[in-house]
Amino acid sequence: MPDSPFGDWDGTPAGARLLQQELAGRVVLRDDFPDLGLIAGVDVGFEEGGGITRAAAVLLDANTLGVLAESLVRIPTSMPYIPGLLSFRELPAVLRALAELPRVPDLVFCDGQGIAHPRRLGIAAHLGVVSGLPTIGVAKKILVGTHAELGSHRGDQVPLMYRGEVLGAVLRSKDRVRPLIVSPGHRVSLASAPRLVMACVTRYRLPEPTRLADRLASRRA
């Protein structure tokens, strides 16, 4: 894992937006991942009024969805919440949590956006570019874009459109539940991202990697 996900960023919001534009140009939107043996989910929570960032990573068997390992790290939060710059607040802890897993996953599911972002660099895309890992963003809400009416059944999906471009899919993971916003992060195609998410959905609305990471990240010591 990289020492820093931010390169020579000057620490300002304006500089962060410029870096997002640069890194977005490195995103690979084609399937470039191995046969999946290990997958991971990552999510972030906060403690002490946002002063501590708590990141969880869960490693699973891609075939059985059984949990193989998990890690939870807590570090001081280094940046306030700024819309559109979430990865600058969360990635340092996420990278440490992934580094503490005993093995490197073949694919990482992130609780958050992939390219479905104003500058095409949500946390999943940012993580993928700086780590080199294939990533998918699985968000609970739309950050940008619009979509056509969505069917009510499991597996129904429609494109998420933004400024004439498809940035992801609005996906119904279970019958008559609120949809997920699925977008590729890095080294995963627009077509494959929803399929890979659905392969990890069991009894719950969220796919197992992010559901389990969310549960771990929400757990306080």
Curated annotation (Swiss-Prot):
It is an enzyme of class 3 (hydrolase). Belongs to the endonuclease V family. The record marks 81 as: Interaction with target DNA. It catalyses: Endonucleolytic cleavage at apurinic or apyrimidinic sites to products with a 5'-phosphate. DNA repair enzyme involved in the repair of deaminated bases. Selectively cleaves double-stranded DNA at the second phosphodiester bond 3' to a deoxyinosine leaving behind the intact lesion on the nicked DNA. Its cofactor is Mg(2+). HAMAP family: Endonuclease_5. The gene is nfi. One of its GO terms (cellular component) is cytoplasm. It comes from the Bacteria. It is found in: Cytoplasm. One of its GO terms (molecular function) is single-stranded RNA binding. It comes from Azotobacter vinelandii (strain DJ / ATCC BAA-1303). NCBIfam families: PRK11617.1. Coiled coil: none annotated. The keyword Membrane does not apply. Pfam families: Endonuclease_5. GO terms for biological process: DNA repair. This is Endonuclease V. Keywords: Cytoplasm, DNA damage, DNA repair, Endonuclease, Hydrolase, Magnesium, Metal-binding, Nuclease. Mg(2+) binds at residues 43, 111. InterPro entries: Endonuclease-V. Its EC number is 3.1.21.7.
